[in-house]
């Protein structure tokens, strides 16, 4: 029971390619084929991997050079990528609840699949990204409270939902279950600390973490793209819902003249809808 699964394999600098399989499992494909079919008429949803046939297959494949990833310092990659050797990184993205935001109309905006009642318990027991070297667990990575990839810090810089805007969407630290597999033979510069508790904090390990974040960002980009254009489709079909959502966002981002106008528009929309509901109730009372 998961929303996304990402499997990344790197065979070392001789090959130089990341082989990545991304499986989408968050949205109801049957509803995409019917109720949300207009999504695939959008120009932004007419190229790989966003076409309907790719959603129907669920899993798609990417090949990327490490240099294709979004890395803070690509010059460092040229000198150090050979030092961390082969690795495999597999992770699952899973929300705690059917929707990961509390905005009005969120469930109508996105055709979510139902989730298992046991998911929250499973997440609590397994959350985090663990490291295994030659099939043995390397602690403390992935233990409760050990956010060694600093996913929580990334999220706090921009805690917006995946459908709110393009770019800047980040996974939450409590939404990922993953494992990194390395070997002592291929990853000689990823060395144990003298205490045997963790790996030495050196340039190679820093780069390795940046590469893992770069792989996570491939998932984030995909989910952000899909959810953003689903949100655009909903706003096109529900302009009052868009006005309310803009007002909600404006209340969180501080005062400006533009935000003031959005809040006023949102207030007027809500008042109009309440008046319409009151008229409906009056008619029912008079029946």
Locations of regions flagged by a protein language model:
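Interdomain "switch/hinge" adjacent to the Bergerat
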Residues: 1-128, 132-144, 191
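Charged, glycine/proline-rich intrinsically disordered loops and linkers
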Residues: 40, 149-162, 246, 250, ...
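Detector for Asparagine
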Residues: 14-15, 25, 73, 96, ...
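GHKL/Bergerat-fold ATPase module
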Residues: 116, 124-228
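A sequence-composition feature that detects small, non-aromatic residues
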Residues: 8, 38, 94, 117, ...
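Generic serine detector
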Residues: 47, 67, 97-99, 116, ...
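Intrinsically disordered, low-complexity regions
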Residues: 13, 17, 86, 104-106, ...
């Amino acid at each position: 029971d998961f929303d996304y699964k990402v499997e990344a394999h790197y065979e070392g600098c001789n090959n130089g390619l990341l082989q990545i399989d991304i499986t989408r499992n968050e949205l109801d494909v049957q509803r995409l084929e019917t109720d949300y079919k207009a999504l695939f008429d959008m120009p932004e949803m007419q190229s790989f991997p966003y076409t309907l046939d790719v959603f129907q297959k669920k899993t798609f494949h990417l090949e990327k050079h490490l240099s294709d990833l979004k890395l803070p310092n690509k010059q460092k990659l040229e000198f150090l990528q050979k030092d961390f050797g082969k690795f495999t990184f597999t992770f699952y993205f899973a929300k705690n609840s059917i929707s990961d935001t509390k905005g009005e109309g969120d469930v109508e905006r996105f055709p979510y699949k139902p989730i298992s009642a046991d998911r929250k318990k499973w997440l609590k027991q397994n959350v985090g990204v663990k490291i295994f070297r030659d099939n043995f667990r390397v602690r403390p990575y992935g233990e409760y409270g050990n956010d060694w990839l600093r996913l929580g810090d990334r999220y706090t810089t921009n805690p917006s939902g995946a459908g709110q805007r393009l770019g800047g969407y980040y996974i939450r630290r409590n939404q990922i279950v993953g494992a990194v597999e390395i070997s002592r033979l291929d990853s000689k510069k990823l060395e144990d600390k003298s205490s045997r508790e963790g790996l030495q904090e050196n340039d190679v390990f820093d780069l390795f973490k940046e590469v893992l974040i770069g792989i996570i960002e491939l998932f984030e980009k995909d989910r952000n793209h899909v959810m953003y254009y689903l949100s655009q489709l909903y706003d096109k079909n529900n302009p009052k819902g868009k006005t309310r959502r803009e007002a909600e966002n404006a209340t969180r981002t501080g005062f400006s003249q533009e935000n003031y106008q959005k809040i006023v528009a949102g207030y007027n929309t809500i008042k109009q809808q309440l008046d319409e509901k009151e008229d409906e109730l009056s008619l029912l009372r008079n029946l």
